[in-house]
Design a protein with these regions (language model features):
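Gram-negative/organellar outer-membrane beta-barrel architecture
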Residues: 22, 103, 119-328, 332-333, ...
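Acidic, glycine-rich loop-and-beta core segments that form the ion-binding/anion-interacting portion
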Residues: 59, 63-70, 136, 334-340, ...
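Outer-membrane beta-barrel transmembrane domain signature
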Residues: 465-488
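One-face residue pattern on beta-strands with alternating periodicity enriched for small/polar residues
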Residues: 185, 266-268, 312-318, 337, ...
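Extracytoplasmic gating/loop element in the C-terminal half of outer-membrane beta-barrel translocons
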Residues: 156, 366-469
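Long hydrophobic segments that form regular secondary structure
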Residues: 60, 137-141, 339, 446-452
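Interaction-mediating elements
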Residues: 1-136, 140-158, 162, 167, ...
Length: 529
């Protein structure tokens, strides 16, 4: 048997600074976590000495010695701390070595560093450099160690150790149904193409109902100053109904259903103006055609049968201070984007805003908050284009509801002879809306038994969101304006798999509307929130 006696509780009576503080005593005093009048706390003492050492490193003192010396008054159960500091010698960085990057080129990592070789050691710049490398999203672990140089007391080497994650994915899929027999899908994505740091993606889907061809490439260092360039080209054919459709007791073939054909291309540039801020601007050309067919919602009637062109101009701003793009524990992410189409057949303005905040609750547990807002409006007295609508519901927005199901729903469609018909069986066509509001709250922790592995974590969540429709799209056209707020709560699992971010969530809708389509268990690869 082991007997443990905790002893008396001591209270901090005072905190003093002693030693060489480079004439910056007030700066160091602001870093003290030990509070007089509060019970002694070993964690606060350790946090204070570490904060002092880190602050010394910002002035080139990589090996500063800081010690919290206690002076104990046992009669009064008081303890006074004297923080003794000796900066030691100032050092500069001789070399920066990189280890563990089997695929990624050295230059991809080095260009993110703000601590340079042959420069004074700077703790803030080293931390910023580590975070910038981590935000690339290519690595599961990024560590920077400081090593002394034997015989050179004023020099150090930095060793950057990274652990690479799979950044490429090839997906092959096949599906079978009575309606379309066999459909094939193919996708290839490389976030770090040939170790260059460039993104290259190709998606192909041969389904009769949703045919897609998308090519995208991003060069994050299109210029040596860090200006990025993204080029996208796409061709999509969408037929919303994938089940058997009957008209006059006769099955309608897939090629007889109405379809939306979209094609276009865009180019976008990103110009950094601080370490965490970037301005984006670009332009594109889009052409959308709605071919008449069976089951076309009435909302598409005004745009059917012709090609509708848009020339969207984009302008945006982004700020990213997260400590990691893969599994953030602290920091903030914000992005504002505006899209204006002043020319072409479709004239509209569209704006989106996203905000994320990550707060460490403990060393292992993180609180995460995400909000997404969207707004769109037609210009020149025109309605907002319906195929530019926002959607919500499902993973990535409000979990527990069918993907894209929130907001207005069409109950009527254009029949074969131009007549107005009702969808049978209480079914709807989801229309989306021109206004969007979604909020997500998550508490994230390591999966039991996974240790500090950031690639496997579990989370609890609460989601809230809604979609509002444009009155010009819905007035008198057989629409249910199911635009009330929805909410859900549940638990989930996230895994950074070789195929990409995988998320599995079980959600219980706690606020819903009549007619909502629920999906309590949802699974998807590629969603970030």
């Amino acid at each position: 048997m082991v007997n443990i006696h905790e002893g008396d509780k001591f209270v901090v009576s005072d905190v003093e600074l002693d030693g060489n503080y480079l004439g910056r005593e007030e700066e160091f005093k602001s870093l003290v976590k030990i509070r007089p009048g509060q019970p002694y706390n070993a964690d606060q003492v350790a946090e204070t000495t570490k904060a002092f050492s880190d602050h010394f490193s910002n002035f080139g003192f990589a090996f500063a010695r800081v010690e919290a010396v206690p002076e104990i008054d046992r009669e009064k159960n008081l303890v006074k701390f004297v923080l003794q500091a000796e900066p030691s010698r100032r050092a500069y960085v001789r070399r920066i070595h990189i280890e563990g990057n089997d695929r990624t080129r050295d230059e991809v990592i080095r260009r993110e560093f703000r601590q340079f070789e042959s420069s004074w050691y700077d703790g803030d710049k080293i931390k910023l450099s580590r975070d910038r490398v981590d935000r690339l999203g290519f690595f599961t672990e990024v560590d920077v160690d400081t090593q002394e140089i034997p015989g050179s007391p004023d020099q150090v080497d930095l060793v950057v150790r990274v652990k690479e994650k799979p950044t490429g994915a090839v997906t092959l899929g096949a599906g079978f149904s009575s309606a379309e027999k066999v459909s094939l899908s193919f996708g290839i994505k490389q976030e770090n193409a040939f170790g260059s740091g460039n993104y290259l993606g190709l998606d192909i889907n041969t389904s009769k109902y949703n045919r897609t061809l998308v090519l995208s490439t991003t060069d994050p260092y299109f210029t040596q100053d860090g200006i990025s360039r993204t080029i996208d080209a796409f061709y999509r054919t969408s037929r919303p109904y994938s089940g058997d459709v009957y008209v006059d007791d006769q099955v309608v073939k897939a090629d007889q259903l109405y379809k939306i054909v979209s094609k276009g291309a865009s180019v976008r540039f990103g110009v950094p103006f601080s370490e965490i801020d970037t301005v984006y601007f670009g332009a594109g050309f889009e052409q959308t055609k709605i071919d008449r067919g069976v089951y076309m919602p009435r909302q598409y009637e005004a745009l059917a049968g012709k090609s509708n062109t848009a020339i969207p101009l984009t302008l945006g701003w982004g700020r990213d201070s997260r400590d990691s793009a893969l599994a953030p524990n602290s920091g903030r992410y914000q992005r504002v984007n505006a899209e204006l189409s002043p020319a072409g057949d479709l004239k509209y303005v569209k704006a989106t805003y996203q905000f994320q905040q990550y707060v460490p609750v403990t060393k292992a547990v993180t609180f995460a908050f995400n909000t997404e807002l969207g707004w769109g409006k037609g210009l020149g007295g025109n309605a907002y284009p319906i195929f530019k609508n926002f959607y919500a519901g499902g993973l990535g927005s409000v979990r527990g509801f069918e993907q894209g199901s929130l907001g207005p729903r069409a109950t009527e469609y254009i029949g074969p002879n131009g007549s107005i018909e009702k969808y049978s069986g209480g079914s709807y066509s989801y229309l989306g809306g021109n206004k969007k509001a979604v909020m997500n709250f998550e508490l994230i922790a390591p999966f039991p038994g996974a240790g500090n592995d950031k690639t496997l974590r579990w989370f609890t969540f609460v989601d809230v969101g809604t979609i509002y429709g444009d009155k010009e799209q819905t007035r008198g056209l057989g629409v249910i304006n199911a635009d009330g707020m929805r909410a859900s709560a549940g638990i989930g699992l996230s895994w950074i798999s070789p195929l990409g971010p995988l998320r599995l969530a079980w959600a219980n809708p706690i606020r819903k509307q009549p007619g909502d389509e629920l999906q309590k268990l949802q699974f998807q690869i590629g969603t970030a929130f």
